């Protein structure tokens, strides 16, 4: 099971009714946060989720509305008596930016592990999450993220017995472990069938449409995408500032065909994103204009 919460849906500045865009994932007791702008910890408090289990924080880029909430968030995690390391992930320059922000949060009861992304496409694993980072097209270096909870194939009892694999190792092999036993190397592929569809969520914001977005969001359970402007006359603003129109996002959704799509990162001038919903659903029917606090409980497909 993967729980997703879109903590905020705003871009540029927080508003009384709209926090800045940020997404939290929960799986197997480990939380992953993407972006941490001003007020993110308040949005998390309103949701009722704890900051203590946040093991990973990914940043799309280093504009203030995506990272300025980090010092307070880290201090709150410390006040919650967290002591385990926290992994910070983002484009090149993260160590410098975090170092500057930590001048107002110098003492933490847990270490920070900083990993900078430098390639156009990178993959890493953090706890239960397999994370793909892919570069998008903003005014500064910016990444989108796809998080996946993989799922192994079914356990094949007959294959296990035929290879005389002791039953005491079956559960460990099913969990993906490799075992050395009496001179033999027992591997999961010896007893598991083909991998099954996992759970995937793609999150991207602050970008013009690029092919990589639809590629990574293809057939996802949930696709969370920037929709900065709904008004068609704002297309010049979107192009100049490297943001995305509702209609452009909907076209990416049509191409990727996720099971569900949420728009986020609305311009502060956009009071009622839902006014454009009928228009963009003509492009991609499964698109929604998200609101702060929207959640989804995503599970594996039934066999």
Features from the language model and the residues they span:
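Metal-dependent catalytic neighborhoods of phosphoester/phosphodiester hydrolases
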Residues: 69-77, 98-101, 271-279
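Conserved beta-strand hairpin/beta-sheet module of binuclear metal-dependent hydrolase folds
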Residues: 1-47, 85, 145-147, 193-204, ...
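Active-site metal-binding motif and surrounding structural segment of the metallo-beta-lactamase
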Residues: 38-89, 113-121
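General small-molecule cofactor/ligand-binding pocket signal
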Residues: 5, 89, 113-118, 132-134, ...
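A gly/proline- and charged-residue-enriched helix-loop-helix capping module
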Residues: 96-105, 114-119
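Binuclear metal-ion centers of metallo-dependent hydrolases, dominated by the metallo-beta-lactamase
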Residues: 119-121, 210-303
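Active-site-proximal loop/helix segment associated with metal-binding centers of metalloenzymes
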Residues: 16, 129-203, 207-216, 222-224
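Active-site neighborhood of phospho(di)ester-bond hydrolases with catalytic His/Asp-centered motifs
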Residues: 34-37, 54-62, 90-91, 202-207, ...
